[in-house]
Amino acid sequence: MLILISPAKTLDYQSPLTTTRYTLPELLDNSQQLIHEARKLTPPQISTLMRISDKLAGINAARFHDWQPDFTPENARQAILAFKGDVYTGLQAETFSEDDFDFAQQHLRMLSGLYGVLRPLDLMQPYRLEMGIRLENTRGKDLYQFWGDIITNKLNEALAAQGDNVVINLASDEYFKSVKPKKLNAEIIKPVFLDEKNGKFKIISFYAKKARGLMSRFIIENRLTKPEQLTGFNSEGYFFDEASSSNGELVFKRYEQR
């Protein structure tokens, strides 16, 4: 199984690292082309394009400027330990064992606007470039056109390497849109997390994002290899609802805490 998750806007380059092992991103030539385009933007243009404050725009203009093609543990850190958002709160990679990192390196991929596809131990320099941003480039009007089939091809390589044909889609719609399902040599399973609110079950963004991380951790910790094993997921009160599920969609629900 290959698990797909989204990156996070919040980054952590200060906390102690729980592993010293690292690999290098496999699509850096593409990243370098995007950096070339991003460096043309002024902070006000970045602010408008990304819908962020002037302060954040200044920080990200500096990140684009400081980005270097040579990645070292001094100027970068492992992606799975650098991202800090709701998904990564659930994942808690900072508590992984070396064996957990090994399994994750084979079975987990992070989709990225700048790096395309990241393995957990791939070094990553800080950036902010969401997949849905309309950054004009040499290949088109946005990042979806820039990446084209590249991300899908890289995922197919990972699937072939593990002799598998199942993708667990725990990424957001914005990021999964960078994947071409018809060209992906895999069955796609999408876990959906519903929380009860005033007697009704619905997707609540914060909880759903954290649950994607919890599910990723559940797969990694238990070394799961078959999609039917996912139905045993019960972290933080979630349970599998077979009646609401279908072949491609596994529905998990959680009752409101009273």
Swiss-Prot record:
What processes in GO biological process is this protein linked to?
A: response to hydroperoxide
Which InterPro entries does the record cross-reference, listed alphabetically?
YaaA (IPR005583)
| Any one cellular-component term (Gene Ontology) | cytosol
A Pfam family this protein belongs to?
H2O2_YaaD
PANTHER family in the cross-refs: PEROXIDE STRESS RESISTANCE PROTEIN YAAA, PEROXIDE STRESS RESPONSE PROTEIN YAAA
Q: NCBIfam families per the record?
A: PRK02101.1-1, PRK02101.1-3
Q: Which family does it belong to?
A: Belongs to the UPF0246 family.
Show the HAMAP family listed in the entry.
Answer: UPF0246
- What this protein is called in its record is UPF0246 protein YaaA
* Taxonomic path: Bacteria, Pseudomonadati, Pseudomonadota, Gammaproteobacteria, Enterobacterales
Q: Which gene encodes it?
A: yaaA
